[in-house]
Amino acid sequence: RAAGLDVRGVMGYEGHLMMVHDRDAKREKVEAAMAILLRAHELVGGDIVSGGGTGTWDLNTWCTEIQAGSYTLMDTQYDELETPFEKALSVLATVISVSPKGWIIADCGLKALGMDHGNPSWDEGDVFFCSDEHITLMPRELSDWKVGDRVRIWPAHVDPTVARHEQFWMVEGDTIRDRWPIDLRHW
């Protein structure tokens, strides 16, 4: 230890295990990862053993602090896991074009969505393509859509999606309840 350094604990993150679907395999791998972190804790001391995440929160019984953050907003990737959490973050876009060939275009794309975990999802049909500023959607019923309609897009990864925006709009149904600024942008 360096002179004058006040160690409060250790922090690890078994991020490579978040999306393991086999619960028994995940439990075994979390235990192995935490054994390494607990050994580091023995060496440096402190009160805090920080680790875990949204994908391992219920299996990680070794940490004194769980780092789960995505659970508050969820995304389409974490939604694939069996968790008690529901998606809460979406990007609201406006339909700007309706093609008679069966698709619609809305005004959100790569610059509005975190795409590192794949395509976003849409409850009313399929996401066909995302360009920088637009998303091409294949609705189940094309006749239901017109220019100016709103579409709710569910991001595949909430963290980089949040970093692309200035504020959250808290909505309940069609009512805006509050607006929260986003401090950390462009990370």
Sequence positions of predicted segments:
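Active-site loop ensemble at the mouth of alpha/beta enzyme cores that anchors a bound cofactor
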Residues: 26-28, 55-124
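C-terminal accessory subdomain/extension
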Residues: 99-187
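Residue-level signal for the start and early helices of compact helical domains
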Residues: 2, 8, 62, 82, ...
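Conserved active-site and cofactor/substrate-binding residues in soluble primary-metabolism enzymes
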Residues: 28, 32-36, 87-90, 132, ...
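Noncatalytic linker/hinge segments flanking ATPase motor cores
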Residues: 7-21, 46-52, 86-94, 107-114, ...
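Generic secondary-structure boundary/loop-capping signal
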Residues: 8, 14, 63, 70, ...
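Active-site loop/helix belt of alpha/beta enzymes
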Residues: 1-83
